[in-house]
């Protein structure tokens, strides 16, 4: 029996056999530690009833561990050079489908409908390329896909921002966007030494469990996120200054903004990072009614 793909020796053999060279532009860093891969699968609670979407399978190291436990794995791979490698390394597993496509351009909902009809739940599990982590996660959340959750490895700093609490250094618009849709928790720190090539920073695994509905009720989701973006536009400025300077028509509506801040008992001298998601929702709803 061949060793697992993720063992350093097997990874080296595969890369040598295909003369594969890493593309920095695609953020390719392959994991060479089977124990860590298995812990990721554990955190995703993958069972024989789970359908799994993987993004960026590389040479199939995580895919293999997922395939051993899941009912079905569908992996999106953007790099054409990896397709013959994946066909080879994953040949023992009949429950794996590789799609050669950029997941950001893919109709993921249709893929789910076609591929996972006989699965009880769907998880996204992946070692995401650093350079597109946030766009991928926001696409998965904003498209309201029928997912149970998302368990992904990403840059440690980004994971900390996603799971951050108000008033912390890491808390910002990304924290609120992710926590609006999910319950977020960093479940593992992964040292940079277990990758080839070795990245410059450590990684973390974050678990995002989809909420039944948004964390807070908002009158208009689009305006809510517009308000969040404006509130964090310049972190050192007060909330009032940020809203006046960064909301469309903010300057013309300064008195309205001040009035709504007063009505919602939010001090305009505070900074955006001190507001909870509930306070942002109250402010968003008040402003939306007053402005539109």
Curated annotation (Swiss-Prot):
UniProt entry tagged with the keyword rRNA processing: yes
GO biological process, one term: rRNA methylation
RNA-binding keyword on record: yes
GO CC terms in record: cytosol
Domain of life: Bacteria
GO molecular function, one term: 16S rRNA (adenine(1518)-N(6)/adenine(1519)-N(6))-dimethyltransferase activity
Reaction(s) the record says it catalyses: adenosine(1518)/adenosine(1519) in 16S rRNA + 4 S-adenosyl-L-methionine = N(6)-dimethyladenosine(1518)/N(6)-dimethyladenosine(1519) in 16S rRNA + 4 S-adenosyl-L-homocysteine + 4 H(+)
Keywords: Cytoplasm, Methyltransferase, RNA-binding, rRNA processing, S-adenosyl-L-methionine, Transferase
Compartments, record wording: Cytoplasm
EC identifiers of the protein: 2.1.1.182
Span of the signal peptide: none
Role: Specifically dimethylates two adjacent adenosines (A1518 and A1519) in the loop of a conserved hairpin near the 3'-end of 16S rRNA in the 30S particle. May play a critical role in biogenesis of 30S subunits.
Family: Belongs to the class I-like SAM-binding methyltransferase superfamily. rRNA adenine N(6)-methyltransferase family. RsmA subfamily.
Xref: NCBIfam families: ksgA (TIGR00755)
The protein's name: Ribosomal RNA small subunit methyltransferase A
Source organism: Bacillus subtilis (strain 168)
